[in-house]
Amino acid sequence: SLQSIKETLLVDSSPKALYITSPDYYGMVADIESIAKICHQSNTILLVDNAHGTLLNFLDVNIHPIHLGADMCSDSAHKMLPVLTGGGYLHINNSDYVSMGKTAMSFFGSTSPSYLIMESLDLCNKYIQESLKSDLIRVIENIQKLKYRFKDKFCFANSKEPLHLTFLTWKTHQSGLDLANQLRRFNIEC
């Protein structure tokens, strides 16, 4: 909770960074803006694992962690964009942390980077500039139609993030396998 983060960071001077995941696997988004304010009041770096939120920057309302005040944010591009597995972006929002980011990457990076992954990121950057916005509008519309079509049959988790479709099977008293079989009849694989 925001209160527990505030109590921990403002009372205890030992945390140097706060690492959170947002959105989570189910599309639930943390209040990054409020968390960033608390972190900055206590001189704590806010690092966000945005693995499932790579596209948040391109929504009508930008809720990408960097836009909301995170100091650093990692996007797993391969999860939501046409990028080879392992391709991702590290965004650094504070110039004071650029050298720290480069140093950390030198510890974890390979001396033999994958040029295929790097090329897929470059091609994806081109796609983002040329086609993503129109494709994103279409995908969001399709997700909304799907939610409407199945609103009486399934329960969906509420999320600020419109690109995740999370079925709450426990509310409909069915197993995930039952749901998968039902969706398969509509050519939907999950």
Enumerate the predicted regions with their spans.
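Short beta-strand
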Residues: 155-160, 190
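Residues at beta-strand starts and edge strands
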Residues: 86, 161-163
